């Protein structure tokens, strides 16, 4: 696996852990939000605005990282936003604060995605691009499998 450089490993592992943390929350999030007073409509609005935030910010911050010529700060800030937002969602009880935390999480995704993908591309040759991106995606998907599994185990023992 010579095409998997240290940078690719680091980005892939960070992606795995971030996705595991996110996917632990998502299955129980609607139940939690409903228990603190969110209506079904408000949950839908929250998720729609959060995903729109990620979608619209990806292009902007991707171009900004290209223009700045620096990718690592965008990746670090993006993952930091996502990491900070997870405990915020658990400790906040007011809908506006939960809304804020969820937007920060998706904003972090928008900040990091373009720069992270550019870093992965920079680490690959034309022959290894598919392998590098495939490896990263598989680690991300593994995180998406681990997260709900850990949540299920936790909820089984601590309902």
Question: What do the predicted segments below correspond to?
Answer:
Residues 101-142:
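Cytoplasmic helix-loop-helix junction between adjacent transmembrane helices
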């Amino acid at each position: 696996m010579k095409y998997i450089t240290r940078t690719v490993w680091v980005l892939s592992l960070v992606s795995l852990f971030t996705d595991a943390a996110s996917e632990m929350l998502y299955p129980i999030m609607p139940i939690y939000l409903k228990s603190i007073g969110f209506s079904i409509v408000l949950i839908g609005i929250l998720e729609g605005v959060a995903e729109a935030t990620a979608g619209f910010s990806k292009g902007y911050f991707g171009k900004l990282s290209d223009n700045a010529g620096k990718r690592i700060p965008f990746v670090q800030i993006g993952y930091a936003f996502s990491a900070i937002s997870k405990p915020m969602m658990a400790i906040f009880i007011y809908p506006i604060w939960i809304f804020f935390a969820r937007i920060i999480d998706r904003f972090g995704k928008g900040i990091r995605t373009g720069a992270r993908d550019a870093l992965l591309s920079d680490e690959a040759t034309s022959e290894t691009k598919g392998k590098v991106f495939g490896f990263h995606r598989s680690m991300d998907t593994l995180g998406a499998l681990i997260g709900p599994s850990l949540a299920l185990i936790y909820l089984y023992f601590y309902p």
